[in-house]
């Protein structure tokens, strides 16, 4: 297979950029409605084809670049360099694996795993949502279905997709699945593969959506817990003294105006709160498993504003004050940017430095990383082998993968404001910020942009 030169690749991308710039400058006032729709259709074809052009680049990166060269995983490198979400980066990698050309161990080119789907995308006949439906089909299809039938099914779905909307394709794929695998996937292995719970991002009001698939065992366990804690009258936050251990009496049941979904929420909260308070979860990264929250003295005194947990969640001050009365949590206070005090409701042999880092950094300090404090390690900005000291002013938080980057050419240092700067090796330096503001959105909105490379 012929390989294009760097000059040819650069020239092709330059020509593509110039052509698109010309299209962006077009004034389409003279076109009729049918002509406008035809133009949009042509643009959609090219939008779809661009996705196919990325597959070879992504697969080559996956095959030749190590984490040291990328500055992390391929998923992280794509997310940070292209300014896309990690989820979108994962989607593109998975699509490239299925639709991009591959190479054998001997170097010989291999066709795409979903050959017909890849060909349809290259021609611009199907888009991202069509591909998603076809990938979902094969994710559910039993491994017992032989290769010939799988290839025929893929070719049929790809052909159907070229003349239908993705939502219409879904119904056809479902029918095809029923014909090929009428009994469904009911094995323990299939159930274990599909299990999972996801918490969505916090919305503006602080609420979070939860979704997922529960195994029969987890469902049975939750049912047993909620039968007690989510019963009418139980764990009612509107009661002055909520009934938790005992059986609610008739008055408690009568006072309870919550919906079943609200009772489930409150019962789950009561169960997890009791588990935290029991102390039976042991330790996590050197601290007893508990809730760590940071806030300012001004907000605490005014009983307004929000605290930030070690997991990166925002907690309204009213909730924070109520939480402090129920369990052994930590509350770190700041006067401006300076740590003021550390309060906790139970004497524990725990590293105070880690708690203050939870409050100060809130998460991994490497730019582009969104790992919260609960998932981060303590990192010595100046290597311990140099100072032989563990000084709070020379510590920061870094997730495991980023912590290991320091051994692969990355350097860290503190600036005059006490922020941690991450300096990449020369081959990874493309002018990215040195300071991570992801965990401190208030600094991005209220302070001048002073974290540019220098």
Swiss-Prot record:
Record domain HNH: where: 364-405
Source taxon at top rank: Bacteria
Protein name per the record: Uncharacterized protein MT1995
Organism name: Mycobacterium tuberculosis (strain CDC 1551 / Oshkosh)
Disulfide bonds listed in the record: none
CDD domains, alphabetized: HNHc
Family that this chain belongs to: Belongs to the Rv1128c/1148c/1588c/1702c/1945/3466 family.
GO molecular function terms noted in the UniProt entry: endonuclease activity; nucleic acid binding; zinc ion binding
Region described as Disordered: spans on this chain: 415-434
């Amino acid at each position: 297979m012929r390989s294009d030169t760097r000059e040819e690749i650069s020239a092709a991308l330059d020509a593509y950029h110039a052509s698109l710039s010309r299209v962006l400058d077009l004034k389409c006032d003279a076109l009729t409605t049918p002509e406008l729709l035809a133009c949009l259709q042509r643009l959609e074809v090219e939008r779809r084809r661009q996705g196919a052009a990325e597959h070879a680049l992504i697969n080559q990166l996956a095959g030749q670049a190590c984490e040291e060269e990328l500055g992390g995983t391929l998923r992280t490198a794509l997310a940070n360099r292209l300014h896309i979400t990690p989820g979108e980066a994962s989607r593109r990698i998975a699509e490239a694996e299925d639709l991009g050309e591959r190479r054998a161990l001997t170097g010989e080119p291999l066709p795409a795993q979903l050959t017909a789907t890849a060909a349809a995308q290259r021609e611009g006949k199907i888009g991202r949502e069509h591909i998603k439906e076809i990938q979902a089909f094969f994710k559910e299809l039993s491994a017992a279905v032989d290769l010939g039938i799988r290839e025929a099914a893929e070719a049929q779905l790809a052909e159907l997709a070229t003349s239908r909307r993705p939502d219409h394709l879904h119904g056809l794929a479902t029918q095809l699945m029923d014909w090929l695998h009428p009994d469904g996937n009911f094995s323990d292995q299939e159930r274990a593969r599909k299990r999972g719970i996801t918490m969505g991002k916090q919305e503006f009001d602080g609420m979070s959506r939860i979704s997922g698939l529960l195994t029969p065992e987890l469902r049975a366990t939750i049912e047993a817990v909620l039968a007690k804690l989510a019963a009418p009258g139980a764990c009612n936050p509107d009661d002055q003294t909520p009934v938790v251990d005992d059986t609610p009496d008739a008055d408690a049941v009568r006072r309870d105006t919550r919906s079943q979904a609200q009772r489930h929420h409150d019962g789950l909260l009561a169960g997890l709160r009791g588990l935290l308070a029991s102390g039976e979860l042991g330790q996590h990264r050197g601290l007893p498993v508990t809730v760590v929250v940071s806030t300012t003295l001004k907000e605490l005194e005014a009983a307004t504003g929000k605290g930030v947990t070690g997991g990166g969640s925002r907690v309204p001050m009213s909730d924070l004050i109520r939480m402090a009365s129920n369990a052994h949590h930590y509350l770190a206070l700041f006067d401006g940017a300076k740590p003021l005090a550390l309060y906790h409701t139970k004497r524990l042999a725990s590293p105070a430095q880690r708690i203050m880092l939870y409050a100060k950094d809130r998460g991994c300090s490497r730019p582009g990383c969104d790992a919260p404090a609960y998932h981060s390690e303590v990192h010595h900005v100046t290597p311990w082998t140099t100072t032989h000291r563990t000084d709070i002013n020379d510590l920061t938080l870094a997730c495991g993968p980023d912590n290991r980057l320091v051994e692969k050419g990355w350097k860290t240092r503190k600036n005059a404001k006490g922020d941690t700067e991450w300096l990449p090796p020369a081959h990874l330096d493309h002018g990215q910020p040195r300071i991570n503001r992801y965990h401190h959105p208030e600094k991005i909105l209220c302070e001048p942009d002073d974290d540019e490379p220098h």
